[in-house]
């Protein structure tokens, strides 16, 4: 039986959020490199610690803004804006 489009979208959103809430330093560094964002291992560790085990929803505007504010505190506003662009690509916005 084929998944309904809405169910399919919810499933994909779940996968993205699950990855966000369990991302590791190496994965963050790889994503940063793929998207041309300078990120040190120490910064990646800090971001991963902020995200790990939380129930953030990247598709929720207030959650996304909360995450970006935490990231801006680690890497600065300019790089947080670059990361926001990646988030928007991931969420299709």
Question: Could you tell me what each predicted segment is?
Answer:
Residues 13, 41, 54, 58-62:
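Protein-protein interaction and targeting regions used for scaffolding, dimerization, and localization
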Residues 36, 52-59, 75, 79:
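Short alpha-helix boundary/capping elements
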Residues 61-92:
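Long, compositionally biased
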Residues 31, 47-50, 86-89:
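Short acidic/histidine-centered micro-motifs embedded in hydrophobic/aromatic stretches
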Residues 47-56, 68-69:
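Amphipathic alpha-helical segments that form the core helices of the histone-fold
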Residues 12-41, 45:
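N-terminal acidic leader/helix
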Residues 1-17:
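Intrinsically disordered, low-complexity linker/tail regions enriched in Pro/Ser/Thr
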């Amino acid at each position: 039986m084929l998944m309904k489009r809405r169910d399919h979208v919810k499933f994909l959103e779940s996968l993205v959020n699950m990855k966000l809430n369990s991302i590791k330093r190496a994965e963050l560094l790889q994503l940063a490199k793929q998207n041309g964002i300078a990120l040190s291992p120490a910064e990646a560790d800090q971001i991963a610690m902020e995200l790990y085990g939380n129930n953030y929803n990247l598709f929720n505007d207030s959650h996304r803004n909360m995450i970006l504010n935490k990231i801006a505190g680690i890497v600065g506003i300019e790089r947080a804006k670059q990361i926001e662009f990646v988030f928007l690509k991931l969420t299709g916005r």
